[in-house]
Structures are given as C-alpha cells and as structure tokens.
Amino acid sequence: MKEIISRHKAGEQIGICSVCSAHPLVIESALRFDLNSGNKVLIEATSNQVNQFGGYTGMKPADFRDFVYGIAQEVGFPRERLILGGDHLGPNCWQNEPADTAMEKSVELIKAYVAAGFSKIHLDASMSCADDPTPLDPMVVAKRAALLCQAAETTATDEQKRHLTYVIGTEVPVPGGEASAINAVHVTREQDAARTLQTHQAAFRALGLDEALNRVIAIVVQPGVEFDHTQIIHYQPQAAKALSNWIKETPMVYEAHSTDYQTRQAYRALVRDHYAILKVGPALTFALREAIFALAQMENELISPEQRSRVLEVIDEVMLNEPGYWKKYYRPTWSQAMVDIHFSLSDRIRYYWPHPRIRQSVEKLIANLNNVTLPLGLISQFMPVQFERLSEGVLTPTPHNLIIDKIQDVLRAYRFGCTPDVA
C-alpha cells in the first residue's frame, strides 16, 4: 500500500481497487484478473463479516486470511502481492453495548486482525454506543481511534510495521448498505476532512503514537458517490473540487466507499482527484448474481425439468423463509419486495450464497451445465458480453469461466480508473 500511495503522491495517476467480499468466486475472480499483471490485489473484510467471535461468515481474522491464502494457492497467485485489509474496525458490531465494553471488544478485534497479518487497518470509532450521545464529539472519535491504533502498534512485529498502514475517518453509509432510498449525497467539506486529520493527530500524539501517524495513508470521505436499491448517484468532480484540492497539501490520499456502479470514466476521475482507494463490494456480488441467473436460464433450455437445479426457486424459498438480511431494507409490498430480492443494486442476496440449500443448488446448476455443450447462441442471449469475449478467443465457455469473467467485467472498469496506461 505504501508504494502505491507514494507513487500517487509523486504525481502518477494510480489507485487501487479494494475488493470487499468474502465470496470465494469473487476473491478468485480478483486474483485471476491480476494473476499476470504484477499488480497488488487488496482484499478487505469488514468487522461484521469477520471478527474475533466469527462474524456473520463464521470466520475469525486468521480464518479469513487462511481462506484467502487457500484460494490464492489454487489460482497460483503469489502471497507477496496480496494485501489484506480490515474495514470499519471499531465498535460497529457492539453499538448496543456500553462504550467501555464495546471498546474493550474493539481493541481485541484490532489485535486479532493485526496478529493475523492484515496490514491495512481502517480505524473507525465513529459510531455511538449505548451510553453515548449521538453524534459523537469528533475528539471522542479520535481518542477512541487512537486507542485502537495503540492496540495495533503493540501487537505488530517490527517486520509487520514495515507494511502496516492505517485509514482514518468515516463518512459512509451503515456497513452493509443504505436501508432507505437516497435523493442526494452530502459531499464532505474540506474543513471537516481537515478537522478529522487534526483531531486524530492530536489524539495519537497524546498517546505517544507519533511514529504511527506516519502509517496513516488515507482519510475516508464522501466525494458524492452512492447507490441504493434502484438509484446510483454518479461522481460530479466539480462538486468535490475543494475537497480534492485540500488533500494535495498532505502526504495522504482519500479512500472512497460505495463506489459500486460508477462509470469507468468516473473511476479515472476519482483517482485523478486523489480518491486513490476505491472500495467495491455489492457490484461484484451483483455480477455474480447476474451470472447465476443467466446460467439458470440456460439450464431451463438445456436440461430436462426433473434434472434441473431449481436454483432460482430455492433462492426465493430460502430468502422468503429467512428474511433477516433483507426485510428492513426492501419495500414491504410482496410484488415489489420480490423485485428487490432479485435485482436490488444493494444485492442483499449476497448474504444467502453460503446457505446450504442455495450452495447445493448452485453446485447442481454448474454440474448440469458442465455435462452439456453451451450453444453460442444461448450464451449470446443471456451473457452477450461474454459471447463477445468467446468470439475473440479469450474465454472458454464453461459455467465457471463465465461466472468469473462476468465478475471481472466490474474489475475491468476499476482497472481503467486505477491504471493510467489502460485504454
């Protein structure tokens, strides 16, 4: 990370896409995409996904590390080009508890991530706990972030500290996505970004963490990009011009969250304007979902009814029977909720892919289609971009390859934005 930031600050229009997903096919797609490029790949876990208690994935930080390393070994991707990051590390998961208890758990969370070898750490203590006022005083946020940084510094070995980096600040929606429709987005004011930096500098120095300040590489801000279930708010460079200019006077860059579904030109503009770390998550699993749905349509054309996976029906049954991950996010009317379940840009389906019934049906779908030849016309009908790549001779038409390539369509847009010499 430090090398990428140094190159950016030296004037090179370079950035990095942060892959925020625990789905094995998404991680495989990212690693295969850059297998021969020489580029680093940044993969991040959030505190609610992965923590010392297991998170909703059931993985602790060391488990997630081993999970990613296992995929890298299968792909042949060298570990030295992998960067592991932790996102929203702080009391996010324990906001319903008193601040003292939540911060004790947050300190242990940080220690677990650093001990597992994660080198990019987002120190996010912005959320109010059960006995806190709302919103929190910025100095309280900074002091708590400093305590988290102290935990990281005492845990890291001297060798780890050579690569350890921190991200501070937060001006993002709740981790996991917006719960309601958006109409406009407030772009961070440059004076607020400056205050974030100043309060954190003061809090770090008060704990004797002057050396750690040199490891702070980025500030999270809102440059004016967002999405909800049906809408995308696109980047408007002019609206963020003052913010973009301010960061030039610091040794840092910005980190932008919720950059999913922006255009490839927007990614290039964001990197040009010093939002050099671009987070993406739901857009990747949305592409995965599109690929699974497309393959299900092909299966209906090629496989006899009694042999089909029924994957779309299984998804519906599971999500309707177990609505915990989507109910408070989607519209209450049944017909509208079904559209959201299938096609929402926030892609709450992503929480259901590990479900045993859904996983088994996806495996059967892929097995069924592996046993037949996929007609080019059928691929053209349901996956036209992949059909073009087949025609160019750069893709072999297996179900697995089609899924991987579909996810990589998203990554191609980020590569265009993050790599100046890509046309």
UniProtKB/Swiss-Prot annotation:
Keywords: Galactitol metabolism. It comes from the Bacteria. Gene3D superfamilies: Aldolase class I, putative tagatose 6-phosphate kinase domain like. InterPro entries: Aldolase_TIM, GatZ/KbaZ-like, GatZ_KbaZ_carbometab, TagBP_ald_GatZ. It holds the Pfam family GatZ_KbaZ-like. One of its GO terms (cellular component) is plasma membrane. Pathway: Carbohydrate metabolism; D-tagatose 6-phosphate degradation; D-glyceraldehyde 3-phosphate and glycerone phosphate from D-tagatose 6-phosphate: step 2/2. Belongs to the GatZ/KbaZ family. GatZ subfamily. NCBIfam families: agaZ_gatZ, PRK15052.1. Component of the tagatose-1,6-bisphosphate aldolase GatYZ that is required for full activity and stability of the Y subunit. Could have a chaperone-like function for the proper and stable folding of GatY. When expressed alone, GatZ does not show any aldolase activity. Is involved in the catabolism of galactitol. Forms a complex with GatY. This is D-tagatose-1,6-bisphosphate aldolase subunit GatZ. It comes from Salmonella dublin (strain CT_02021853).
